């Protein structure tokens, strides 16, 4: 382009179009900026023309009325002026500096003349720009008046622009005259360029409206309705442009048929009086399409006809629905009066209106631009390898890599003509368009574009192809051009052609994406060097042209010679990039990224096999491969994808999974997804450190972004930690948190996901290491060298092992810790291979075994004690930042107030924790490091079993975390360590004590006291507390929270924290549910241990004991595998729901977190779970042990799974619990998740889990239906909460992962109830058996268990504690549901939890209609929606108004967040139904 421009601009500025456009565009902009340019031009003009200042001035004055454009166009130099003043010096109108520079650098030099500037200076910026332009362009260019619209002129003699504002004319060009200027110059548009030209060069031609009409009918609808908005019609130059014919037709149809047309138009309940019919848009309703041969068609109706009357009633201004109803009322007889508007489109007009489209010309182009920006951002971000490669390929490579293709293009362009060249050039510069165009064209033509690219001579074939492609395109354009249409028309056609080509290719790719991949995939592999491109190439096909375009472009860009090196590099860069994308699709994504071509070849073959859930990959890929996902990603979740695109690619990459996840979760758990969005937004702002740091965080989906951001942030921290000796082991763990799930998804898909979350970060840095292995290696780097190898190896079938290693990063710490604990050789349930002790599955299995043993052992008095000790959960709940009196609370505290910090810390802590976990992994492994893998927090799960956790949970946790002591010498463990892992706790650093406390609890099993050090407890704590309270009251809130009710955000950067926390929890805070456990323990110290145990069960693990019961109730069945998860009421749900939640909220990369979020019910871990959950968890604590073990593995898996949203290999693959949850989730959102889980879960287990999942779902429903059961429990509220929660959760989360989510929340509720109501003994008793039999217990069984538990709980010392706790929770359960408890509140009311608020506030004892305004305010506060109480009070909303509040009313009351509205509506419904 540059060369062409230079060539042309040296003498004339042939591309007047640019200036013309600029001028046109600048007209509005003609403000200071424009004037400045004008001034400069003016001075230039003056210099060149040497026009006297007076002349300039006069010109300026006279031109005041002229449009800046015209003024500009008016040459200010009289001397060589063709007419009037101006010599059209190429530079007089230097509107577009670039052109000016190109065109007349010399002139520019001469031009600048201060004097003239002075002349212009009188016209200050305020002065008319026109005036400026006038004196700038004195002379012929002065606009005297507007031309009569609609007249058509044809150029009779060619004209080359002499000045900037002029346009070139070629004989035969159709020229549309826009205005008449001085000096015999007219302003008009030709070939899409607008500018001045001598009037003598054109001759008027009589329009042949009919001619146009013929062309317009078909095009009319498109042109009119597709490309123009109503506004543009009005602004269309004039009615004269439109040929209007009206007709009245009578349509008579048969009963079984329609009229054969599709009506489209503005929606309005009442006629839109503001609508002013115009010739171009005479009515609001028009025929979008008419079925050929249909009744309407036969009557002469055509697409684009406007409905003026329906059955003799005027409908010009009537809204769509009303018109449709009027048509329906007529039955089979319809009288329509329609107006057919035929636009008299001259090529100029078309060009003018469509010129803009050229930029839009191809979605590809737009994408390209966007991609470019993304790439640029990525470059900035540091995806230097992947992003840079892609960027370079796209941006720079166009010249470097595309050189061959570019030359061909240039040649072709030149041959075709400057305009064609221009068009081509544009795509070329975009690179994307050309490539995509070519691809699309080739694809459509059945040409294997990729093959040349892929196969051996990337250069030749690729370039050749591109050339061919280009030629083809050109030829197409040429054909179009040569089809006998005038040059002008040709030009118009050309851009449209490109546009169509691109559009077609793009759309085709979208629709045909799946098929194309199969045919093309083989080709793309060859470009493996450009792994990004080639491998993607097929994928792109799959996804759409966008991808292919990218691939092609990159390929084209990549020079043949460079191909090997570049390919390798690109492959690395892009490979990394795409690897993530591809990983989504391909089990061998790793292979793809492998350095050796062989893997790529394998990948190709695999690539052919799309993941069962391409979209699960899409999210990842989309984020990762900024371009590829464009189509599928968009399809699945355009919002996310686009966000990613617009955001930096890195961001996208980083959140790829989350993105996808986000989408799904959004839909499924309306509340959560909403919140996720808000979270992402808030978090990003609030938690730049956590979320922001990872650019990927900005991923489209707030949730994904938040989670991804948190993960990325954490990964970055991990990276730093890794780099630092202190955190080496933890680092790995943390990294794995992000990557952990990928371990299971070690398969390319999974790992990519990892890459998306963790890897991406890594990718940024070590991304380049190798094309194929680099991404993994990066992960490995983060995980640890050994891990990398394992990952690579496991990339395929043994994803579990490899993944385990990978996940080790995140869960790795846990896993690693775990591995010593579970050195037993576990056999992969699915593959039958020996599992790596540190693999998530092995850890999960070992955790499960431990849990079983522990559950058999009984919970000891610990849990009960914890419960008794722990009113903490209340405190915690009440105030997230308050230490509720025990470490868990502290942790919550940390979370609440330090949410952001916590998030960051958590990540960091997670990292350190993970590292520590690595150090202690032997001890921790028992804890179900799997869960911890995902979330360091989970690590503590097994440890939880040990009642003798140690001193206070906090201490214990700290110690455990800090100290890698086995057992729970948590108190021994230095706080510093916990702090390090504190990140995990988020508040761990701030509140190491709390974390240790949790840890201790987590250390519930004596064996796993060491595990506690993982600091998993903190997350559980939050989770637990939340769960506990929310278990009873606000399981749903998590979704809502995600949905938008980020009450938790109040706690700390709630929105981000929520996500971050979620992520953290998932990763390191998975233990949040354990938080619940923590709070469960009545006594701080004793309780702590149980609590710790609960906590220890990271969100999922902790749950096993407690969750188990709860799960039984709410879906513990699921928890069977994830019984450990069940242990935490939330945790259990977490496990079940962890997948769901994870999917919903934290799908991105932190199962645990997600789990926690859901488990917490309301405020997921993310929001305030940490603080509030603890109190709630208290009761749960005692259960922690029994369920703990099972859950632990479960959660771990879940956590792992969640992080690897990539296509999960087999839904059942993951741990039972995880698999269960993940299955739904996997199918829905992440293939990886399942994969991740699968390593953890055995085949049978997976199946069982699936079964349990469904059962749990049903149970949840049943449970929610049986609040009575819950009520029967000593903690009736809990039970009730559980029940309501369960169903709500189901409903809320059901979208996301119906069962998982539902149960996720519900289990929390159930669990909390169970935990709180059941004595630890009971729990262990029940838990063990239940777990053993199947997490799924009949709802009756669950209720039985729960019911008995309450009595047991009451009887057992824990029970009193539970009762106490319950009393808090219980009030909290109802109130909590509404967010009365801080914990509850902090999680924005979980929709499902929104039961009656369990609160001591008066409103809880009164019927809704008797509530006073303060009661309503208290109720809102209980829903964690205290931010709205003022408006409710101001508007005097009392209980009698609540049932009648509609969405609009709520919006008027300031409840603009969907999640908040949902929470309110759900809570209201529960209140009214209670």
Curated annotation (Swiss-Prot):
Q: According to the UniProt record, list the residues that bear Phosphoserine.
A: 457, 586, 724, 1334, 1338
GO molecular function annotation: ionotropic glutamate receptor binding; SH3 domain binding; structural constituent of postsynaptic density
The UniProt record lists the SH3 domain at: 148-207
Record's subcellular location: Apical cell membrane; Cytoplasm; Synapse; Postsynaptic density
Superkingdom is Eukaryota
Q: Kindly state a single biological-process term from the GO annotations of this entry.
A: vocalization behavior
- Which residue range or ranges hold the SAM domain? 1411-1474
Give me the stretches of Basic and acidic residues compositional bias: 711-722, 847-868, 899-920, 1119-1130
Q: Where is the composition biased (Polar residues)?
A: 66-76, 1075-1085, 1307-1317
Q: Which segments carry the region annotation Disordered?
A: 66-125, 392-413, 504-534, 659-920, 947-995, 1057-1153, 1195-1216, 1260-1401
> Domain PDZ: where?
248-342
Q: Which Pfam families match?
A: PDZ_6, SAM_1, SH3_2
User: Which residue intervals are annotated with compositional bias (Gly residues) in the record?
Assistant: 783-795
Glycosylated sites = 1292
Place the motif SH3-binding on the sequence. 1169-1175
Phosphothreonine PTM positions:
486, 903
Which regions are flagged for Pro residues bias? Answer: 513-529, 1202-1212
Per the record, what is one GO cellular component?
asymmetric synapse
Q: Summarize the subunit comment.
A: Is part of a complex with DLG4/PSD-95 and DLGAP1/GKAP. Interacts with CTTN/cortactin SH3 domain, DLGAP1/GKAP and alpha-latrotoxin receptor 1. Interacts with DNM2, DBNL, GRID2, BAIAP2, SLC9A3, PLCB3 and CFTR. Interacts with ABI1 (via SH3 domain). Interacts (via proline-rich region) with PDE4D isoform 5 (via N-terminal region). Interacts with PDE4D isoform 33, isoform 4, isoform 7, isoform 8 and isoform 9 but not isoform 32 and isoform 6. Interacts weakly with PDE4D isoform 31. Interacts with ABI1.
Q: What does this protein do?
A: Seems to be an adapter protein in the postsynaptic density (PSD) of excitatory synapses that interconnects receptors of the postsynaptic membrane including NMDA-type and metabotropic glutamate receptors, and the actin-based cytoskeleton. May play a role in the structural and functional organization of the dendritic spine and synaptic junction.
Q: Which family does it belong to?
A: Belongs to the SHANK family.
- What's written under domain? The PDZ domain is required for interaction with GRID2, PLCB3, SLC9A3 and CFTR.
Protein name per UniProt: SH3 and multiple ankyrin repeat domains protein 2
Give the species this sequence originates from. Answer: Rattus norvegicus (Rat)
What taxonomic classification does the UniProt entry list for its organism?
A: Eukaryota, Metazoa, Chordata, Craniata, Vertebrata
């Amino acid at each position: 382009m540059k060369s062409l421009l230079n060539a042309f601009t040296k003498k004339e500025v042939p591309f007047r179009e640019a200036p013309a456009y600029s001028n046109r565009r600048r007209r509005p902009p003609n403000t200071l900026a424009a004037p400045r340019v004008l001034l400069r031009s003016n001075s230039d003009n003056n210099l060149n023309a040497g026009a006297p200042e007076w002349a300039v001035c006069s010109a300026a004055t006279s031109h005041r009325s002229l449009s800046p454009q015209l003024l500009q166009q008016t040459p200010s130099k009289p001397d060589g002026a063709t007419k009037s003043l101006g010599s059209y010096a190429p530079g007089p109108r230097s509107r577009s500096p670039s052109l000016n520079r190109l065109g007349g650098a010399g002139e520019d030099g001469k031009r600048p003349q201060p004097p003239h500037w002075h002349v212009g200076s009188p016209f200050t910026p305020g002065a008319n720009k026109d005036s400026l332009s006038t004196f700038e362009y004195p002379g012929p260019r002065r606009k005297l008046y507007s031309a009569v619209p609609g007249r058509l002129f044809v150029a009779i003699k060619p004209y080359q622009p002499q000045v900037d504002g002029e346009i070139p004319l070629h004989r035969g060009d159709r020229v549309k005259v826009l205005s008449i200027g001085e000096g015999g110059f007219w302003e008009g548009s030709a070939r899409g360029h607008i500018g001045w030209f001598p009037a003598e060069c054109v001759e008027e031609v009589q329009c042949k409206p009919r001619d146009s009409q013929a062309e317009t009918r078909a095009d009319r609808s498109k042109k009119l309705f597709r490309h123009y908005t109503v506004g543009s019609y009005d602004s269309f130059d004039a009615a004269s442009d439109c040929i209007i014919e009206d007709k009245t037709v009578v349509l008579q149809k048969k009963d079984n048929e329609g009229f054969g047309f599709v009506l489209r138009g503005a929606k309005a309940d009442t006629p839109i009086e503001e609508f002013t019919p115009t010739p171009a848009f005479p009515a609001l309703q028009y025929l979008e399409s008419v079925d050929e041969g249909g009744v309407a068609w036969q009557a002469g109706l055509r697409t684009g006809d406007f409905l003026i009357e329906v059955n003799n009633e005027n409908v010009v201004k009537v809204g769509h629905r009303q018109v449709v109803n009027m048509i329906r009322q007529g039955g089979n007889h319809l009288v329509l009066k329609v107006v057919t508007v035929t636009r008299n489109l001259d090529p100029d007009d078309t060009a003018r209106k469509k010129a803009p489209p050229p930029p839009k010309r191809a979605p590809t182009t737009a994408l390209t631009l966007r991609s470019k920006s993304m790439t640029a951002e990525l470059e900035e971000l540091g995806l230097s390898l992947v992003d840079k490669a892609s960027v370079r390929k796209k941006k720079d490579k166009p010249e470097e890599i595309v050189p061959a293709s570019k030359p061909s293009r240039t040649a072709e362009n030149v041959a075709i003509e400057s305009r064609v060249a221009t068009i081509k050039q544009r795509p070329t510069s975009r690179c994307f368009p050309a490539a995509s165009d070519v691809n699309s064209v080739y694809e459509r033509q059945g040409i294997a574009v990729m093959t040349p690219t892929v196969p051996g001579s990337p250069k030749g074939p690729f370039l050749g192809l591109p050339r061919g492609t280009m030629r083809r395109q050109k030829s197409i354009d040429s054909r179009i051009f040569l089809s006998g249409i005038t040059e002008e028309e040709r030009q118009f056609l050309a851009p449209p052609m490109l546009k169509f080509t691109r559009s077609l290719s793009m759309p085709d790719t979208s629709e045909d994406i799946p098929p194309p991949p199969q045919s093309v995939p083989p080709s793309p592999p060859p470009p493996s060097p450009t792994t990004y491109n080639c491998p993607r190439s097929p994928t792109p096909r799959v996804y759409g042209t966008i991808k292919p375009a990218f691939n092609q472009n990159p390929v084209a860009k990549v020079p043949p010679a460079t191909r090997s090196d570049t390919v390798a590099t690109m492959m690395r860069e892009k490979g990394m990039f795409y690897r993530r994308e591809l990983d989504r699709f391909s089990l061998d994504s790793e292979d793809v990224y492998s350095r050796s071509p062989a893997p790529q070849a394998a990948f190709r073959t695999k690539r052919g096999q799309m993941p069962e859930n391409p979209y699960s990959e899409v999210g990842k890929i989309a984020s990762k491969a900024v371009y590829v996902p464009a189509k599928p990603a968009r399809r699945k979740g355009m919002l996310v994808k686009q966000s990613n695109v617009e955001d930096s690619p890195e961001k996208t990459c980083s959140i790829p999974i989350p993105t996808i996840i986000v989408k799904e979760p959004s839909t499924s758990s309306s509340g959560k997804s909403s919140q996720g969005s808000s979270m992402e937004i808030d978090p990003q702002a609030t938690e730049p450190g956590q979320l922001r740091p990872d650019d990927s965080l900005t991923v489209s989906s707030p949730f994904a972004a938040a989670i991804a951001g948190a993960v990325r942030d954490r990964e970055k921290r991990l990276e730093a930690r890794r780099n630092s000796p202190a955190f080496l082991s933890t680092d790995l763990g943390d990294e794995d948190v992000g990557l952990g799930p990928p371990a299971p998804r070690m398969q390319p898909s999974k790992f990519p996901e990892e890459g998306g979350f963790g890897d991406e970060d890594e990718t940024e840095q070590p991304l380049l290491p190798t094309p194929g292995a680099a991404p993994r290696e990066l992960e490995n780097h983060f995980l640890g060298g050994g891990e990398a190898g394992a990952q690579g190896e496991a990339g395929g079938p043994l994803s579990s092992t490899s993944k385990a290693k990978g996940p080790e990063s995140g869960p790795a710490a846990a896993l690693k810790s775990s591995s010593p604990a579970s050195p037993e050789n576990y056999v992969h349930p699915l593959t039958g291979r020996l599992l790596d002790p540190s693999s998530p599955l092995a850890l999960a299995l070992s955790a499960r075994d431990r849990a079983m043993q522990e559950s058999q052992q009984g919970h000891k008095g610990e849990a009960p004690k914890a419960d008794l000790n722990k009113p903490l959960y209340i405190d915690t709940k009440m105030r997230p930042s308050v230490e509720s009196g025990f470490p868990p609370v502290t942790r919550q505290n940390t979370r609440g107030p330090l949410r952001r910090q916590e998030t960051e810390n958590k990540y960091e802590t997670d990292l350190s924790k993970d590292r520590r976990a690595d150090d202690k992994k032997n001890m921790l492994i028992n804890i179900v490091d799997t869960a911890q893998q995902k979330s360091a927090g989970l690590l503590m799960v097994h440890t939880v079993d040990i009642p003798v956790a140690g001193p206070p949970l906090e201490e214990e946790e700290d110690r455990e975390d800090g100290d890698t002591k086995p057992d729970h010498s948590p108190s021994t463990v230095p706080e510093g360590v916990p702090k390090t892992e504190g990140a995990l706790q988020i508040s761990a650093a701030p509140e190491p004590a709390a974390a240790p406390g949790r840890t201790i609890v987590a250390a519930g099993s004596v064996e796993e006291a060491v595990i506690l050090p993982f600091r998993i407890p903190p997350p559980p704590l939050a989770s637990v507390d939340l769960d506990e309270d929310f278990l009873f009251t606000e399981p749903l809130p998590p979704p809502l929270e995600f949905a938008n009710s980020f009450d938790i955000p109040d706690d700390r950067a709630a929105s981000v924290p929520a996500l971050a926390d979620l992520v953290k929890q998932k990763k390191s805070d998975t233990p949040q549910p354990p938080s619940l456990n923590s709070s469960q323990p009545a006594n701080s110290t004793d309780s702590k241990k149980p609590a710790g145990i609960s906590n220890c069960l990271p969100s999922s693990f902790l749950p096993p004991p407690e969750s188990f019961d709860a799960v039984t109730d709410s879906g513990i069945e699921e928890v069977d595998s994830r019984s450990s998860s069940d242990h935490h009421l939330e945790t259990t749900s977490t496990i079940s729901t962890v997948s769901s939640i994870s999917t919903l909220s934290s799908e991105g990369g932190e199962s645990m977190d997600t789990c926690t979020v859901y488990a917490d019910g309301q405020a997921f871990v993310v929001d305030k779970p940490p603080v509030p959950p603890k109190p709630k968890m208290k009761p749960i604590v005692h259960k922690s042990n029994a369920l703990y073990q099972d859950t632990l593995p479960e959660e771990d898996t879940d956590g792992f799974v969640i992080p690897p949203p990539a296509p999960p290999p087999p839904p059942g693959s993951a741990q039972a619990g995880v698999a269960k949850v993940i299955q739904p989730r996997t199918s829905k959102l992440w293939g990886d998740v399942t994969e991740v889980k699968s390593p953890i879960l055995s085949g049978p287990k997976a199946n069982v889990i699936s079964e349990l999942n469904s059962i749990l779902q049903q149970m949840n429903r049943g449970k929610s239906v049986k609040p009575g059961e819950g009520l029967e429990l000593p903690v009736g509220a809990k039970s009730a909460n559980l029940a309501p929660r369960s169903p709500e959760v189901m409903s809320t989360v059901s979208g996301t992962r119906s069962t998982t989510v539902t149960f996720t929340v519900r289990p929390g509720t159930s669990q909390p109830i169970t935990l709180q109501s059941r004595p630890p003994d009971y729990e262990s008793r029940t838990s063990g058996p239940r777990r053993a039999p199947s997490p799924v217990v009949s709802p009756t069984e669950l209720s039985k268990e729960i019911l008995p538990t309450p009595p047991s709980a009451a009887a057992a010392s824990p029970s009193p504690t539970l009762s106490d706790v319950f009393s808090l929770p219980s009030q909290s359960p109802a109130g909590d549901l509404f967010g009365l408890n801080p914990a509850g509140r902090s999680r924005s009311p979980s929709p499902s939890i929104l039961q009656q608020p369990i609160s001591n506030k008066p409103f809880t004892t009164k019927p809704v209609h008797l509530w006073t305004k303060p009661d309503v305010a208290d109720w809102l506060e209980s829903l964690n929606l205290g931010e709205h109480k003022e408006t409710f009070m101001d508007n005097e909303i009392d209980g009698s108004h609540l049932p009648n509040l509609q969405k609009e009313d709520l919006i008027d009351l300031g409840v603009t967040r969907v999640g908040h509205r949902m929470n309110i509506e759900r809570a209201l419904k529960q209140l009214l139904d209670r």
